[in-house]
Amino acid sequence: MTMLLDGGPQFPTLGVGGFGTARHHEMSNRDAGMGLNPFTEPSHAAAFKLSPASHDLSSSQSSAFTPQASGYANSLGHHAGQVPSYGGAAFNSTRDFLFRNRNSGIADSTSAGGQHGLFASHGPPGIGEPPGHLIFPGLHEQSSSHTSSNGHVVNGQMHLGLRGDIFGRPDPYRAVPSPRTDHYAAAQFHNYNHMNMSMNVAAHHGPGAFFRYMRQPIKQELSCKWLEESPMNRPQKTCDRTFSSMHELVTHMTMEHVGGPEQTNHICYWEECPRGGKSFKAKYKLVNHIRVHTGEKPFPCPFPGCGKIFARSENLKIHKRTHTGEKPFKCEFEGCDRRFANSSDRKKHMHVHTSDKPYICKVCDKSYTHPSSLRKHMKVHESQGSDSSPAASSGYESATPPAMVSANSEEPSKNSSATHQTNNSSHNTGLLPPNFNEWYV
C-alpha cells in the first residue's frame, strides 16, 4: 500500500496543514493569526468557504498558531523557496503534534544549509522543477530525488517506504509541457521492487530504450501452391493465397482444397508433387502427406529440454521411447534377447540371424546386413579416391572398381598399386574368415 500526500487545496480548520510548493508572496498578520499556510493562495480559502473568518478568530486561537507562522516567516526571509523543519516550536495543537513528528525524521537527516519540509521543492531557489510530468511522474532522474531513513521525496511528492511503492501525480499547479523529455531514459524502476517488476533499465540508454522489447516479430508469408481446376486446354494455376501463420494456411487447405467427408478423391494437387496425381486410400493419409509440402509439424515432444517436433503422431510416439527407455519390439530369433524401440530397427537386426545382406557396395560389390556398416565401408573408398583420383571419390556413382582402373593403367603409381592390393584383399573374402567387427549385432 502506498501513502500519497499531495500538495493540493488547504484545509486549516480541519487540522490539515498546507504542503504546497513554496510561493513568493507577502504574508499578512491576518494569515499568521489564522494559522494558514503562507504558501497557500488566498483564493483557496475563499473557494472552500472556510469559517470562522479571520476577524472572528479569538486571540487564544491566534496565539496557538503563532509559533508555526513565525517559523514559516523566518524561513522565507532566509531560505526563499525552502521550508525548514519545526524545530524549537512547542506542540500547540494536534496538527503540530502529528506533522512535526513526521517531519522531524526528514529534517534531521538533511543538511543545515538546505533544510526541507515534507513536500517542499528540492532545488536551488528561483529554479523550477524539471519538466516531463506527462504520464509517469515517478520516472525522473535520480538527481531529483531525495532519500531519507523514513522515506524519500521525488519532485514535490512524499514517498514513504511502504509495500507496493508507487508515485502519485505531480504538483497540480505545475504547467504540463508538451514534448516528452529524456526522463524516461532514467526510469527508476528500482522503486517497484515490491511489485515484482524486475525491469533493469540503465540510465545511459536513450529515450524509449525499453521499447525495443515491444518490437513485433517479422511476419512470414506462407503461400498456397495448390493447383486449381481449370477448363480444358488451359494450364492450371496455383492458388497463391498468402497467410501470415501456419494455422491459417492449414485451415485454408483443409476447408478449401482437401474437403470434408463428402470428398472421395484423395489426391494431392500441390505444385510439383512427386506423387504425380496418385490417389491416397484415406483422407488422413492425404493430410499427413500435405504436411510435407507445408512444413507443418503439430506434434512437439512433451519432455522438457528436448524441443523436437514431428509431423506425424506415430513418429512422436516412437521418439518418446528414447526418453522413457521403452523397447517393446523383441528379436524373434530364438536365443537372442535384443529389444528395440521400433519395428524397423528390429527388421534390420534380423538380417544378422538370416545371413541376409541387402546393403551392397556399388564399388566392390561387398554386402552388409545393416546400412550403418555400409556407410563405414564407403569411407574407405572415399579416402582412397581422394588419394588416387577424383573419379573414384564417390563409390555410389562409380561403375568401375578402382582395382580394375589401376590394373589397366599403363603407368601405375604407388598410390594406385596400394589401392590395387587393398581391393584384391577385399575380393578374396571367400578364403578368409568373415570380419565379425562389421556385423551389426
Swiss-Prot record:
Q: Which domain of life is it from?
A: Eukaryota
The GO terms describing molecular function are:
DNA-binding transcription factor activity; RNA polymerase II transcription regulatory region sequence-specific DNA binding; sequence-specific DNA binding; zinc ion binding
Q: Which residues form a coiled coil?
A: none
What is its subcellular localisation?
Answer: Nucleus; Cytoplasm
InterPro entries, per database record: GLI-like, Znf-C2H2_ZIC1-5/GLI1-3-like, Znf_C2H2_sf, Znf_C2H2_type, Znf_ZIC
Q: State the Pfam families in the record.
A: zf-C2H2, zf-C2H2_15, zf_ZIC
Q: Which UniProt keywords apply?
A: Activator, Cytoplasm, Developmental protein, Differentiation, DNA-binding, Metal-binding, Neurogenesis, Nucleus, Repeat, Transcription, Transcription regulation, Zinc, Zinc-finger
Which intervals of the chain are annotated as region Disordered?
A: 375-441
- Bias regions of kind Polar residues — which residues? 406-429
Provide ranges: composition bias, Low complexity: 383-399
Report the domain remarks: The C2H2-type 3, 4 and 5 zinc finger domains are necessary for transcription activation. The zinc fingers and the N-terminus are independently important for establishing the L/R axis.
The UniProt similarity line reads: Belongs to the GLI C2H2-type zinc-finger protein family.
The UniProt function text for this chain reads: Probably acts as a transcriptional activator. May bind to the minimal GLI-consensus sequence 5'-GGGTGGTC-3'. Can determine the ectodermal cell fate and promote the earliest step of neural and neural crest development. Involved in establishing left-right asymmetry in the embryo.
What this protein is called in its record is Zinc finger protein ZIC 3
UniProt source species: Xenopus tropicalis
Which taxonomic lineage does the organism of this UniProt entry have?
A: Eukaryota, Metazoa, Chordata, Craniata, Vertebrata
* GN (gene name): zic3
